[in-house]
């Protein structure tokens, strides 16, 4: 059977966006199923429709025959292996290592950014940030600048990779909350936001009820 990716509402679920982009960029055919988040069990991993397909009670989750992968990064890594060498991770070992480190930092960190700049593709507003969020933004911009400088751009590791998929929702948050990236990073942010697959995701998100 074709891989089936269960995701949350496209307007809100940044964790669903990340592996969805990886699958699209890897040119891996898959079916998507949107499971609306909210209502009974929301926030506790107990939404009945999600529990029915995900052992963790969370989305995204990928089903491939009898394989069930319930984590955004694990799904992206599955996509990289399916796509083959040099597609979603670079061939250079140093680029892969630093790309995975950056991706894991996003996967596990930047908590203040995620709390204070919640993902909502239908919103546009500015708001004050805590010192912690400001410090995380500074770290984020340093990370991006360092990778772009080391590998020459135009993507973080030179060519487009899972690392870019994991930071695309952050770029959308910058736009949502009117946060201007440093001048040397504006081109990278614009590249993320101009990606055709992201635009397709956003179009579907804004059409959600």
Enumerate the predicted regions with their spans.
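GST-like domain detector, emphasizing the conserved glutathione-binding G-site
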Residues: 1-129
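Short, contiguous strand/loop micro-motifs
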Residues: 5-7, 158, 175-176, 200-201
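Tryptophan-centric aromatic hotspots in well-structured domains and transmembrane helices
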Residues: 15, 20, 70, 89, ...
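A generic structural-conservation signal
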Residues: 32, 183, 201-202
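Phosphate-coordinating loops and pocket residues in cytosolic domains that bind phosphorylated ligands
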Residues: 52, 194, 203
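GST-like fold's C-terminal all-alpha helical module
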Residues: 106-194
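Terminal-tail/helix-coil boundary detector
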Residues: 202-209
